[in-house]
Amino acid sequence: MKYDNLLDATSQYGPQDLLLGRDGLISTGYWAKTQANILTGTGLPVSNDEMKTYLNLPKNVEIPQDFQKLYDVYNEYKKLCDWWLEKLLSCVNKMANDIYNVGSTTSELINEALQPGLRAITTASNDQDRQDAIQDFHEVCLILMRELDENQQSMKDVQNLLNSFLQGGNNFIGVTQLNNSFEEVMTYLDSQYNDESEIHDLLNIFMQFKKLLGESLEEHEINEKVKFSSELGPLIGYIVSEMLEYSDVQMFKQRIDNFQNLNGVDAQVALVVKVLSLFHGINIDLHNVIYQAERSLEFIEQTEGNWHSIANQFYSLAQGFENEDINKLSTDLDNAAATWEAVANKAKEFVTNSYQG
């Protein structure tokens, strides 16, 4: 269901638009993106064998010593992602449950107690009945004030956990420091595998090989496609996909010095390309997680402040109001009830979807 049309309603007694938008913490779309990045982090490889399995690399491929630096940052990232799922997820769900409870209770009390109370005040036949109706109205306002105040603890808990996630805890570094470690490793690997590095010379070998095959193909009439491209490995196999299953194939093989060495080099180049691509991809995920954690923290701080303000509004309302404000107050409470109900439903959907992954 969509509740954004109801959430457009504004009232000093309602949560206004703090839960609106796709980037809010209580948003299934936002949560899905966050969880996807977190779940990716929990499965990162932290050893050579795990890396080969993760990237589907041949077992005989040697992983360069340089890539050992990756495992330290991956291991810390995995710890953070595991901690997010074990600690933070349950607290966020508890907070969402509290938001649901507050939203439901507030909406119900406004519709079933405050609005009838206003009508009782305006239709009272004598001063005593009017004073009794006002007293009942004030008591409900105080109940709502306490409800809002008492259900802010889960927000504080999530706030503390998000601060730990960003800045670090007793047995793990935070994502802010982890990002610095990522940047250091990234800078080092880029310096080892850029255009001026030795690995780039290997890429040039393949370019020369491609040119050689092209010249050979121009010299010979070709009638059938060859089927041995897989023998040449994933990075150069496509080069010969148009060659023929023809006697000239043997000639091509003989013209390539150290063919098996080139095949091995192909696997090594594939390794470098895959590992560096993975690392750059995970680095992007990390930046997204940091952004999402910071936005979540900002959201909670705003919501907590907003709820405190609403509690004060109900407290002020419990102290009294002027007769001429009753019509406006009734409209404001209608808007607030609709908004609280919408927020409750969004929070309920959020919890349901987060448990479903």
UniProtKB/Swiss-Prot annotation:
Gene3D superfamilies: 1.20.1170.10. Belongs to the cry6A endotoxin family. This is SPbeta prophage-derived pesticidal crystal protein-like YokG. The gene is yokG.
